[in-house]
Amino acid sequence: WGESFGLSKDFATAQRLVAGLRRIGFDYIFDTTFAADMTIMEEGSEFLERLPEIKESGLPMFTSCCPGWVKFIKSQFPDMAGRLSSAKSPQQMFGAVTKSYYAEKLGVDPEKIFCVSIMPCIAKKDECTWDGGKDVDAVLTTREVERMFKAFFIKPEELGEDEFDDPLGSGTGAGVIFGATGGVMEAALR
């Protein structure tokens, strides 16, 4: 996130981003690592459930965590769409947890929660409209966050560091590598 401000990766920490988001006015700020763990646990369970069918047909089960990939399969290879996992992406998984478990934990009506994700890919915006779901209400790209920082006259080099809110505990290393190439498979194998 700090590249557009000319910040080194050592200085542009997630904690500095959190501090900037709090200054903008976000009430709670979470890391989606835990949600990536939940997604991979769901996909792993589904894989084990489907394993007899997979062995018989020789066809794989595909991850469903990338909306661009899901849309590609459904539009270009509709005969393979049944091979997609039914698990929600980490973004959507966390939105659902926010509006159920976390709302209850805070004693807040889920309807009063407006859940915003910050994602590097614009396909995540489209994902929020699928199946009538409103687990995530809005998605900001990292470029849009940069513009927000500038609109609020936030200078990252002047920010301290702040911690993420911790709704369910820490995520694992598997959740951290989820977004890297091959990360979903490595997380599943862990």
Predicted regions mapped to residue ranges:
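Iron-sulfur-associated redox domains of electron-transfer enzymes in respiratory
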Residues: 1-190
